[in-house]
Amino acid sequence: MNDKEAVVLIGHGGSPADIPRALVAELKRLEGERQARRVLEMSPREAELDKQVREWPRTPATDPYKFGVEEIAAALAPKLGGRRLVTAYNEFCAPSVENAIEGLVKEGFERILLISTMFTRGGIHAECEIPGIVIETRKKHPRVQVEYAWPFDAGFIADFLAAQLARAVPTPKA
């Protein structure tokens, strides 16, 4: 058991089906305006909306994405050699990546490994936001080792996808 290392499984996050669309639309508008100004810190209103959306009650029926990530986490946990595993989300779901990391730091973890469910390059979350969070965490907590297991090898992803095809759609026998 490794009581000094933890893993954060990061999912994109999605808004629950029963949340008022106007709430999410306002959040996305404020986020877009902030990003256009190249400002990192949220306004008080954006932070309030972000918290409200992330903490919205969820069920498998209203947010199958979050429960899908949790299912992956449950399957991944026994494969991590005793490392603690938590989930986090880039947007819409709690906890945020930053909050998940802060919780682990407060619990005394010395090494935190981040891995994303987002496999492809080019996405703002996996390619820009998460590396930015790593940089900020290292500055804030220089004694904590934070690593991001990304990008994924294209050949590895291709093998994974080919295996899934073979499993889900068996080749007919001649």
Regions found by a protein language model. Name each.
Residues M1-A174:
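Active-site-proximal alpha-helix that buttresses catalytic centers in soluble enzyme cores
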